[in-house]
Amino acid sequence: MEHGKSSALPQGLLVGLVGLAGALGLGVVLPINLRNADSQTNQNLDIKSSAATTATQQRIEKLKASMLKTWQQEAKAKGLSYVVPPSLQGVVINQATLSPSQKIIALTFDDGPWKDTTVQVLDILKQNNIKGTFFVVGRNLKLYPQLAQRVVTEGHAIGNHTWNHFYHYMNPQAAAFEINSTNDLIYQVTGVKTTLFRPPGGMMHNGLVAYAKNQKYSVVMWSSDSIDYNRPAVPRLVGNVMKFARPGGIVLMHDGGGNRTNTVKALPQIINNFKKQGYRFVTIPELLEMQGKNQKVIATKKPK
């Protein structure tokens, strides 16, 4: 009996060891397989997530394109093309010739759209229920198209201020690029066709104005310069504007092109000063329309 007992122990031990080894082997294999399965699942999820993101981006782009198309159609339907009287096409305009009793003034803003300042200017104009005119730079419009859309949707006028805001002399081809590229983008972004042009720096003899006049643009200058590009103190800036204010006047300010903090601070005071003097605010197209009507009245009064 002792012999049988002693020979049975090793077999039991052997069975136990085999079982333990099997269990250990299974324990080693299972985590590896599970990890592989998890990795495969994560890869599948990543692929699905990436595909979903791409699909979402495509839907967003389609929606944006659809919204832009709808906006352009609505803009055209609303007649957002500034019809300038024939007598004021292809000419330089510093101000409208109105009677002293016609207390009308046009606020204009150059060099935008600008990330922060344009928004602040638009907010101030909206608070005061005033419409202005914005002469945009093409390369800035490309960066902030949504600001130009806001300009137009809130009832302001928009004009061309070239693509690069260069001052140097340009041949007709270069001038055409500067003006046409900007006008094309204005139309693409807002649906507006504008024939309002303002030369950078008021430069009259570097090729831009000659091209613009040849293309029947109204070259819109100004009669009252804020000189805000020199960043004067707010009281001086306000004084610069009011000094030459007159009925039919055009005020030059800037919403872009640099630090326009003082312009934003001065704008409410400028508006209040004009209101106290009985002025009403109009856009450049409205001002030119009034000028055109006045010219017709004068013409009909001339002796035959």
Each language-model region and where it sits:
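N-terminal pre-catalytic segment of deacetylase/amide-hydrolase enzymes
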Residues: E2-L107, W114-V121, Q127, I270, ...
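Hydrophobic alpha-helix-in-membranes signature
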Residues: L30, R198-P199, L267
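Metal-dependent polysaccharide deacetylase catalytic core of the NodB/CE4 family, i.e.
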Residues: Q102-I105, K115, K126-G258
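Residues in and immediately flanking transmembrane alpha helices
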Residues: D123, A174, L267-P268
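Active-site/ligand-binding-proximal alpha/beta "capping" segment
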Residues: Y211, I270-I271
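A SAM-dependent methyltransferase catalytic signature shared across enzymes that methylate proteins
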Residues: S218, Q277-Y279
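Histidine/acidic-residue-rich catalytic or RNA/ligand-binding cores of hydrolases
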Residues: P232-V234, N262-K265, K293-I298
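Conserved nucleotide-state-sensing and coupling region of NTP-binding domains
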Residues: F274
